[in-house]
């Protein structure tokens, strides 16, 4: 009944868009009759209408119709009705759930164009540089055709290039580049260094990956700290003589370690110290990380060793995360465990979670194939509603019920048997595994079965072949083993992907220098095509641009030639000719193979373990049955799998025992399916609570961050920072006077105050505050403030003689330097507070409430410190003038 109500609620939403879609369709002929120039002028017409007070919603039907027509003319692609619905959802600041292959990239152009008309800029966020560049060069042509500017942010861009890209109407950028640019903008020393404009509207592709999977991982800008490397080596050795359930307990659900009293005493005795928790010489942090590295972080599952370094493997995608490091000393603990060089621990200069970063946008939306299972979290944290968009063609994928085995060995045998059956039937098979270790185990098993297969995991030798392997995973009898990395990015096309194979042939010919005669892929093509390719290659030999290209530049030229982007240079034109010749022949070859594969049942997806989130499982299933193709999926499980063992294995094991199921017989029942779903919901709820807790704690820091960044911006924008300095001075004087006047001895009051003010003003020994002023503290403060102003005026006049405007530069420098230094130290203190606050729960205190209270006190201390330090630095600084 609930599902019925739920479905009808979503359907009512979809039905509510019908009138708008109908209106857009009614304009199609009228807009189609416009010339290119008339279509182009529509953009300026829409902008004028908005200036008159017309709303975006009012012009939406005509604007969407204009974009649809531009897409037909520029790319030869017509936007379907369901894609229009998806675009309306994005414009409304919601999440559009659209299945694999439904054309999400094109959907973003409609909402992006409409919102860019306001002149505030639109950010379209992708998960990697390649997708950002591809989308900007491909669908970005639609925006350019209609007169909008298109920007692209890539990792290697300079500040000036970034600034220009962010000033464009539509900017394509990755989530990490966008976040880091925000943090860097709040560390600059002049307004001219800021690259981003004010945030307005953001469309996030693969929104669940960024807002949920990445939610627990903050963006951090850091620098070297002074943490001693020896402590990691010592605690690694110590962890090896500590025993589980004796010296420490492991909480697998929370992925956390708890030292027992016996363990604490043992460690203190072994290290010859009195207190593990001593703030002046803390050891507990290092010990807990060493035990985490030993118990919870497994080689070839959570990380790999490459070039004598620990490289993180993303638990959601299976991809290696080069350049990323675990924070808070955990990475160093794993380096000590693996006996590779231990790199210096870093200190955080600036940080923000994706949760709080994307909430900075007044209007936020996103697209993904899998979000409905997480709609509660997306709504509660981001205020984002999820709406499922119908597929353009009916979904034909068969989803078989799970098979559960009593032990893992029998499960893997059954998976190998299934692969063999599919291989014999001519059906392509994609097997999703959860780790490098499991993927290699299955690969060995399939080798024993003599089943040809491709292996794709985080190992460097396999990562390089990722696109090729996935692009051809839909071919007849192909078997592909992949970690979760296969879930996104490249479509699996039944029969094979002619676009990818054509591109790979060009790379073989031009970069790897494999001749036409020795290229096995080319040998499958007609002699006429081989001859034409040879002629094109010969013509390139005389091209000076081609001759001077580096490998990376040539690879980029090939990518451009292989995509549907406008080109004009001879080199790119010749490369595209070669690409199209190869593509057309392979398209004919693969179309025949596609018919056979479709008749055999299409792509079969095998899941080897349930993930902690149903959403990740759905991503794997979604590889089959794209765009109305046939396909199927099935999960093979064992009660020894991590998810079932930790979150529900006993109940399921008892059920199997009650039904007297032997080791070789899989269990398949409605009751079992419900138990599996309950286990998965339990783990989803657990991790949601974890992310919610991260969010709640980071909200405390976020409010402080916004206050500091607002103060920084006020100083940067100020042409007269003197006012800020004098405000700080008044506050400092208040603090000094209030502190000194609380002294019990009158004589002591006078001496203390006189000494402190004399020091503040950098005055001579003759400086003296009249005792008559002490009777009225407000008059006393006014008098001291006036002395500070006089002192400041004299200092300003002196510096103006040396160099006009020098005092203003010094003011900004001192203000920003002290704020940045204090914020950096504050982040370290907040991190230490966050680590320690959990213990308060043992004293019947709410850790979050305690954290808020102590964080507030730390923040007030920091603000006070900044004000005092700036005022003392300005009033006591001595400028050395160098004579030429």
Swiss-Prot record:
Note whether Membrane occurs among the keywords: yes
What is its membrane topology? Answer: Peripheral membrane protein
Record's SMART domains?
Answer: SecA_DEAD, SecA_PP_bind
Chief location: plastid
Task: Name the InterPro entries for this protein.
Answer: Helicase_ATP-bd (IPR014001), P-loop_NTPase (IPR027417), SecA (IPR000185), SecA_CS (IPR020937), SecA_DEAD (IPR011115), SecA_motor_DEAD (IPR014018), SecA_preprotein_X-link_dom (IPR011130), SecA_SF2_C (IPR044722)
The set of disulfide-linked cysteines is none
Location in or out of the cell? Plastid, Chloroplast stroma; Plastid, Chloroplast thylakoid membrane
Statement: the UniProt record of this protein carries the keyword Ion transport: no
> Where does this protein hold ATP?
83, 101-105, 491
A GO term, aspect molecular function: protein-exporting ATPase activity
Which EC numbers does the record give? 7.4.2.8
**Chemical reaction(s) catalysed:** ATP + H2O + cellular proteinSide 1 = ADP + phosphate + cellular proteinSide 2
Which positions, given as ranges, span the membrane?
A: none
Q: Which residues form the signal peptide?
A: none
Highest taxon of the source? Eukaryota
Q: Name one GO cellular component term.
A: chloroplast thylakoid membrane
State the name under which the record lists this protein: Protein translocase subunit SecA
Species annotation: Porphyra purpurea
